[in-house]
Amino acid sequence: MGLFGKTQERPPKDLVNEWSLKIRKEMRVIDRQIRDIQREQEKVKRSIKESAKKGNREACVILAKEVVQSKKAVNKLYASKAHMNSVLMSMKNQLAVLRVSGSLQKSTEVMKAMQNLVKLPEIQATMRELSKEMMKAGIIEEMLEDTFEGMEDQDEMEEQAEMEIDRILFEVTAGALGKAPSKVTDALPEPEITGAMAASDEEEEEDLEAMHSRLAALRS
């Protein structure tokens, strides 16, 4: 606290260094998230192969959809890392400008990057806090969030899902399901095991639900 109870403003250099540290910390969170999702993806792909061997095409399609959604989630996380790197580079530039002019400068590049970062649920709270601090410091202006992003993503998912599902099934089953990139219409190969399949159907369904829950938790 300063004189008369007023809070003393922090030096701009300290602010920039603190923002950079917070962003690097969130990047490590994103890296862990990506690794977790990718590990789960490999489990799902193994399950697709097992379901294909048993002749369970419906399970294969359900699992392939999970892979599609997971890949989209990972792509978004990588895009967010790129935005974070952009902000970090801008912070370095701010320090260079600060040494010359003695003050922080407004940056449209940081503004655009932060607009994208505040939309990511995994780091939303931290990015909102940083945005407020940057607005107060004069680096960015008040941001208006794009409320149409979710709808746009859903439309894109509908358009590309079938093609991507077919591609994944073809890739994971080594061509047992259809021909990439055309639509999968082929029947699955005959089941390798016929004896205990009926008894294992319920267990397989439970495994599918558990895997779906784990992937959903990682993406949320």
Swiss-Prot record:
Report the membrane topology from the UniProt record.
Lipid-anchor
- Location of the motif MIT-interacting motif: 201-209
Record keywords, A-Z: Coiled coil, Cytoplasm, Endosome, Lipoprotein, Membrane, Myristate, Protein transport, Transport
Asked if the record carries the keyword Transport, the reply is yes
Region feature (Important for autoinhibitory function) = 168-169
Q: Where is this site: Interaction with STAMBP?
A: 214
* Localization per Swiss-Prot or TrEMBL: Cytoplasm, Cytosol; Membrane; Endosome; Late endosome membrane
Specify where the region named Disordered lies, as residue ranges: 181-220
Q: Which Pfam families match?
A: Snf7 (PF03357)
Q: Which InterPro entries match?
A: Snf7_fam
Tell me the subunit arrangement.
Probable core component of the endosomal sorting required for transport complex III (ESCRT-III). ESCRT-III components are thought to multimerize to form a flat lattice on the perimeter membrane of the endosome. Several assembly forms of ESCRT-III may exist that interact and act sequentially.
User: What protein am I looking at?
Assistant: Charged multivesicular body protein 3
Source organism: Xenopus laevis (African clawed frog)
